[in-house]
């Protein structure tokens, strides 16, 4: 799967959510916050920051779900900023 496919799929999901939830306002900041929350959830499930703990990470499936949730919001934020191809991203 390439980046263009991911952007296309995310656009379809975003459009569906906006239509079914009647979202008409700019939600960039909310999506930014949602990304931070998902990254925090990912860190919590991997326990990568819990140097004091002896408990291991969550199951791979749980970690993967949080990772994918983060990717969703990265793509969604990119779409709001007009990024649909890695060639036009400013850091490339």
What are these regions (language model features)?
Residues 1-92:
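Flexible "arm" and connector segments at domain edges
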């Amino acid at each position: 799967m390439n980046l263009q496919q991911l952007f296309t799929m995310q656009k379809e999901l975003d459009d569906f959510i906006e239509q079914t939830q009647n979202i008409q306002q700019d939600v960039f900041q909310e999506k930014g916050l949602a990304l931070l929350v998902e990254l925090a959830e990912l860190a919590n499930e991997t326990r990568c920051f819990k140097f004091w703990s002896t408990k291991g990470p969550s199951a791979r499936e749980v970690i993967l779900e949080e990772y994918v949730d983060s990717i969703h919001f990265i793509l969604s934020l990119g779409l709001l900023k007009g990024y649909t191809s890695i060639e036009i991203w400013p850091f490339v």
